[in-house]
Amino acid sequence: MTYSVRLSPRAARDYKKLEASIKLEVQAGLDVLQDHPLSGPKIKRLKGRLHDYWRYRVGDYRIVYAVDQPARAVYVEYLQHRKDVYRAA
């Protein structure tokens, strides 16, 4: 069963700013999250103040998201370079 992927306004803005080649990789990552948002080699649950979120690695970029299992939805909050993403969160 697939999940719907929804971008926050911040994540949508970050997505628009990406270079075309990175956009393709990120889009492939978002497609993976539709089918398997909670398990996989590039997926990890975050700790500390972000304990309700998960992250998916896409090269040097990170997709930080929350999962609503009853609604079958993935809410992408942040989509940024790894050096910036945890500062923004």
Model-inferred region functions:
Residues D31-Y56:
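A short, surface-exposed loop/turn module that caps and links secondary-structure elements
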Residues M1-L24, R57-Y61, A66-A89:
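Enriched for short, Lys/Arg-rich terminal
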